[in-house]
From Swiss-Prot:
Belongs to the GHMP kinase family. Homoserine kinase subfamily. It catalyses: L-homoserine + ATP = O-phospho-L-homoserine + ADP + H(+). ATP binds at P91, I92, G93, S94, G95, L96, G97, S98, S99, A100, C101. Keywords: Amino-acid biosynthesis, ATP-binding, Cytoplasm, Kinase, Nucleotide-binding, Threonine biosynthesis, Transferase. It comes from Serratia proteamaculans (strain 568). This is Homoserine kinase. Its EC number is 2.7.1.39. HAMAP family: Homoser_kinase.
Amino acid sequence: MVKVYAPASIGNVSVGFDVLGAAVSPIDGTLLGDCVSVEAAETFSLQNAGRFVSKLPDDPKENIVYQCWERFCQEIGQQIPVAMRLEKNMPIGSGLGSSACSVVAGLMAMNEFCNRPLDKMTLLGLMGELEGRISGSVHYDNVAPCYLGGLQLMLEEEGFISQEVPCFKDWLWVMAYPGIKVSTAEARAILPAQYRRQDCISHGRYLAGFIHACHTQQPRLAAKLMQDVIAEPYRTRLLPGFADARKAAQDIGALACGISGSGPTLFAVCDDGATAQRMADWLTNHYLQNDEGFVHICRLDTAGARLLG
């Protein structure tokens, strides 16, 4: 049997709309992500389990893990009879790369089970294609970090889909999911079709400056440049309490605060444990809306998707 864990990810990381993504894992060892197991069988089957299993579609063929199996078999030109099991530990529509977790874990598990017939870039291309079926368009800012780990910059040139950007080992990423759902498609539809020239210039400056600060290891400068002029001004209205949380992050001493992907999860970057804990406590008391919500203090997950057991 093969079992793969795929971690949560932050799409956009504020400053890089559709071109930056970061994988994260809780510092307490909690597996914040999905697991998919594959074992030999006479015919294909798919079993679902996990905390958020009730959110999955009733029709097995609408399950993205089934579609991963189907697309993988098509790619290698062979039907592989297997029993698959999805542990859905990630809330759907959370802004934590939930669909990416299932896609990455599903495709990597099949590839490992079949002794890796597909190379990493081919597999990553399939991951983007499958995730795009859910989000409505192909973009790699969740699947790339989820699969490869770390902070990934999307390139899509010279045979590379993405490459890793050096980040800051001391940073703690406080992740808060309030327990409500925001559709990625809805969150994309709310964005304007065109942007002002000044916004385009600011976006380019922030993104270029952030990448430069990462490569030259200037954490304060990098955090200062984590500003979103593309999505956050429009998506804030979809996120009850986000404006208050952003103000609290500033008061508490977080280096940066932003929307994770399409939301409603937010992240706050801190450079010491005490500040991160104060931020986590505030978010637990003020940002969570029901018992499905949660807060985790995380670090960058540099390993990405990996075999378990």
